[in-house]
């Protein structure tokens, strides 16, 4: 039997400029605006120029990606929690 070392996710050094957040949810009116509004609560420096919105191949889902300056783990967790609380978000990457 061989021992495998615990695999750890890469460490993020804060503040982390241009940190990508990708949100996938049901396509529908106002989804991208909702995502931007929630993220902007926690990252007021969100640059709308970095916003990328894509439809899924069948049009059922949308992905919304933005870049923020991540300040700490608590900020990222708060963004994740608020997005998931909407009931419209399936994944936050």
Curated annotation (Swiss-Prot):
**One Pfam family of this chain:** DUF493
A GO term from the CC aspect: cytosol
Which PANTHER family does the record match to this protein? UPF0250 PROTEIN YBED
Provide the family line: Belongs to the UPF0250 family.
Against NCBIfam families, the record matches this protein to: PRK00341.1
In its UniProt entry, what is this protein called? UPF0250 protein PSPA7_1111
Q: Which organism is it from?
A: Pseudomonas paraeruginosa (strain DSM 24068 / PA7) (Pseudomonas aeruginosa (strain PA7))
């Amino acid at each position: 039997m061989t021992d495998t070392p615990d695999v750890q996710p890469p460490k993020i050094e804060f503040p982390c400029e241009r940190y990508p957040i990708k949100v996938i949810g049901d396509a529908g009116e106002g989804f991208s605006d909702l995502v931007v509004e929630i993220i902007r609560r926690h990252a007021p420096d969100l640059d709308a120029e970095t916003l990328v919105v894509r439809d899924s191949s069948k049009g059922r889902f949308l992905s919304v990606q933005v870049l923020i300056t991540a300040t700490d783990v608590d900020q990222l967790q708060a963004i994740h929690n608020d997005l998931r609380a909407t009931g419209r978000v399936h994944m936050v990457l």
